[in-house]
Amino acid sequence: MSLLIKNGTIVNDDAIFKSDVLVLDGRIVEIAPSIQPTPGLEVVDATDRLVIPGGIDPHTHMQLPFMGEIAKDDFHRGTEAAVAGGTTMIIDFVIPTKGESLLVAYDRWRGWADPKVVCDYGLSMAITSWGPEIAKEMEIVTGAEYGINSFKFFLAYAGVFMVRDEEFYQGMIQCAKLRALARVHAENGSVIAERCEHLLSSGITGPEGHTQSRPEELEAEATFRACTMASQANCPLYVVHVMSKGAAAAIAHHRKKGAVVFGEPIAAGLATDGSHYYNEDWLHAARYVMSPPLSRDPSTPSALMKLLAAGELHLTATDNCTFDCQQKSLGKDDFTKIPNGVNGVEDRMSVVWDKGVHAGIIDPMRFVAVTSTMAAKIFNCYPQKGRIAVGSDADIVIWNANATRTISKDTHHHAIDFNIFEGMQVHGVPEITISRGRTVWANGQLKTVQGSGQFIPLAPDSQIVFSAVDNRKKAMEPVKIDRIPYEPSALQTPDANANIVVKAPVRAAIPPGGASSIQF
């Protein structure tokens, strides 16, 4: 595929400049102020448009089996929605059932994804059980044959995915040994289970019970706990779906102490809030059920965006895990049975541009960083991904910063019958999406080929993640004090009170602090 992009303004995470871009065989081969077209080249006119790296969504759950259902967006529909929104790579999660081999689960996910994806993808691995065999398989899947460089631990979903603190800690020690990133879903699953039982017994069965069972304090507590444990294990930590100010504050606290912690807010948390859970329409409220829940504080979305601007949160994702209205209705009499998950992979880029750049909170370079480049660096596929540069994959979006669109279930490409951003007008529109040199979205139309995406192996030991770990390890080495051997004499049994000097009481003429003026 030969392609020439003319007259555009390139935006990377560290620079903005006008230039043309030449693409051959799926890679960028030249960037220059004026490249002359040759016969056979497809020419794209990007006048008054931005030329940006394709988005990377580092947190999706396509066709995930969960809560007795299967997420509606499979790897075909989900990646079609992604490219329609300007995202050219996703990182999905292999989630084994309790006790299942990581290798067996990995093969199942690859079998689902490879024939369906229309853009590139990578995989992260969830750890839902612990033991010597799991630790051994973690080492295997971080090899080049499997291409896994991160492991996710759930501190929620008791009895399903949740691991105990000691398992989480041991897992992070193994991650650090393998130079793999630990990722965490931070909620207090034990307390949540108790609260759910209490609320249901109190007659609260609707979606409002979901948010009441998972107050923000439980996300903040679990985030702080996870960061503390990761620091003790000397393991870099990535906190997925940061939904509250308290969780973000916990991350900032530990980073200020030198911990290597990354925070990921998601599109839903940047654009909506938890007021929806109290809507009188049960189905409307149920559509927004996800975990952790959306914040009930209406100022949280703006606060999270400002933390992205300040560098206290680091990249954006979606946790795209879609269930339609019929599936959501399975919990009509019990909020704990509402399948958790929302959409986002199609709308993330526009939502972040609208709430960030258009709102004057971040600049276009920071937009590229939090939607693409930072993910590429953290997951060790930079500069292959996440940059407009010679030698990089031609994952490119022609972005119209001045255009607007209204988000709607009637026009989106998800496999569900609602959209949590319904009716929201957003500034910033991907006009053309290019995946490894192939135009997959143009003029509002998909041009995809099922199975044309590639699996991207992700190698461990990302330098942005692990460059400080070795020095931290040296600083954390245990300190031993060399002492003269202590050998108490067995022949001496001194009286415990023998050396105690007892003084006779003496009345102070003027006690310390001065004499009292109180008269009795």
UniProtKB/Swiss-Prot annotation:
Key words of the record: Hydrolase, Metal-binding, Zinc
Cofactor binding mode and count: Binds 2 Zn(2+) ions per subunit.
Gene3D superfamilies attached here? Answer: Metal-dependent hydrolases, Urease, subunit C, domain 1
Which residues participate in Zn(2+) 2 binding? K152, H185, H241
- Which molecular function GO terms apply here? dihydropyrimidinase activity; hydrolase activity, acting on carbon-nitrogen (but not peptide) bonds, in cyclic amides; metal ion binding
Where in the sequence is N6-carboxylysine found? K152
Pfam families the record matches: Amidohydro_1
Q: What class of enzyme is it?
A: hydrolase
Record: residues binding Zn(2+) 1: H59, H61, K152, D319
Xref: CDD domains: D-HYD (cd01314)
Entry comment on modification after translation: Carboxylation allows a single lysine to coordinate two zinc ions.
Ligand binding (substrate): Y157, S291, N340
Q: Which reaction does it catalyse?
A: 5,6-dihydrouracil + H2O = 3-(carbamoylamino)propanoate + H(+)
Q: Does the keyword Cell membrane apply?
A: no
Superkingdom is Eukaryota
Indicate the quaternary assembly.
Answer: Homotetramer.
PANTHER family, A to Z? COLLAPSIN RESPONSE MEDIATOR PROTEIN, HYDRANTOINASE/DIHYDROPYRIMIDINASE FAMILY MEMBER
What family is this protein classified in?
Belongs to the metallo-dependent hydrolases superfamily. Hydantoinase/dihydropyrimidinase family.
The protein here is known as Dihydropyrimidinase 2
This chain's source organism reads Caenorhabditis elegans
Q: Which gene encodes it?
A: dhp-2
